């Protein structure tokens, strides 16, 4: 589908990458884990971690009765859990989503500096102006957005239900604005045939996967199935044996007959994917060709900020201003409307909504 003449221009944004956390010794890790486990009990808190956080963080969430999942399921788990405090190991929009669903709870994050290129690349002032310029369009936004952008939308979607919702809207003759991920939007447009005005954002991790390098790797492992998240470029998606959300890719590794998988998404997913498919070999998809350099190198730099030291600090610091998530109540109520619309639609399909990045 050719780009709409009304679509915003693709801008090259030099995202300010955070410094990598200082590695901890085994003794330090053990001390922090013990402290976190005790503090979770004392503070009546539960830890939820995203699939893209480091394996030791995902393991800690599981060990302490929390969960490892995508951002919406993390928020729903926290809403339904009896704990009064929710520690969200992920990026900022995930903490906001948790607060939208659980306004009465204290939502803490290891650091509020952990953000997302999709969020940064879709500032509310510019996105709202784009929507205002097309008042006859239904606004559909990916869950990987700020609370303010969600509040401006008619629908919020995850990658596991985006196709069904866009098909539904298209069947009703609705004109659609899609934001912010252009690759996911293009994939959905191709699958559904829907005409959509695209916001031109992207995920820095998935945008770096390269089709030529993937083709070279496939020659090395001809028996491997290629699993691709639809936030990847179209040339990479075209090579996939399975395309899907985080949870859908994990399911594919578990159920497909192949013994090897080349995985084009954040390598943090390998922890749960290997749990689901313990006898299978997982291979990182390449983020560049021969001699090429990568910036994210298949791991989100902001997800990497969710270390043990930062998690312990979120629970022990007396000053919560660098950890607690607040969402203005009017904004929260507005953002809840398109989220609820998606969940209600999912009920009509009798499907569980999971799977955003």
Curated annotation (Swiss-Prot):
| Co-factor binding details | Binds 1 [4Fe-4S] cluster per subunit.
Cofactor(s), names only, from the UniProt record: [4Fe-4S] cluster
Name the positions where iminosuccinate binds.
50, 71, 142-144, 159, 229-231, 246
List the record's Gene Ontology CC terms alphabetically. cytosol
Q: Which PANTHER family match?
A: QUINOLINATE SYNTHASE, CHLOROPLASTIC, QUINOLINATE SYNTHETASE A
BP GO annotations: 'de novo' NAD biosynthetic process from L-aspartate
- E.C. number, please? 2.5.1.72
For binding [4Fe-4S] cluster, which residues are annotated in this chain's numbering? 116, 203, 300
**What InterPro entries would the database entry show?**
NadA (IPR003473), NadA_sf (IPR036094), Quinolinate_synth_A_type1 (IPR023513)
What does the UniProt keyword field contain? 4Fe-4S, Cytoplasm, Iron, Iron-sulfur, Metal-binding, Pyridine nucleotide biosynthesis, Transferase
Recorded GO MF terms: 4 iron, 4 sulfur cluster binding; metal ion binding; quinolinate synthetase A activity
The coding gene here is: nadA
The protein's matches in SUPFAM superfamilies, at most eight in alphabetical order, are given as:
NadA-like (SSF142754)
Name by which UniProt lists this protein: Quinolinate synthase
Q: Which superkingdom is the protein from?
A: Bacteria
Q: Which reaction does it catalyse?
A: iminosuccinate + dihydroxyacetone phosphate = quinolinate + phosphate + 2 H2O + H(+)
